[in-house]
A protein has these predicted regions:
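Cytosolic, long alpha-helical scaffolding segments
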Residues: 1-77
Length: 77
């Protein structure tokens, strides 16, 4: 019973990390599209927005790294 509880908690931790990775991937995809559009149109305002919005991607990356390190530390033998 305890093993199942531990496995369920581990699965939840992995699912939370995966959800953040998927969210970050969506933000990266949007940034690439907007960046390409800004380049093509030589739109400096849009390019500046892409650079500014990169902070959200960086923040998610930091959270993902922290979560992954925590899961590894907790689950390591």
């Amino acid at each position: 019973m305890v093993e199942q509880h531990i496995a369920s908690a581990f699965d939840r931790d992995l699912e939370a990390i995966q959800a953040r990775i998927m969210k970050m991937g969506g933000l990266v995809e949007a940034a690439i599209m907007e960046g390409a559009r800004a380049l093509e149109a030589r739109d400096e305002e849009l390019a500046a927005k892409v650079v500014k919005d990169d902070a959200a991607i960086d923040g998610l990356e930091e959270l993902i790294n922290e979560d992954a390190a925590r899961v590894i530390a907790i689950r390591a033998p």
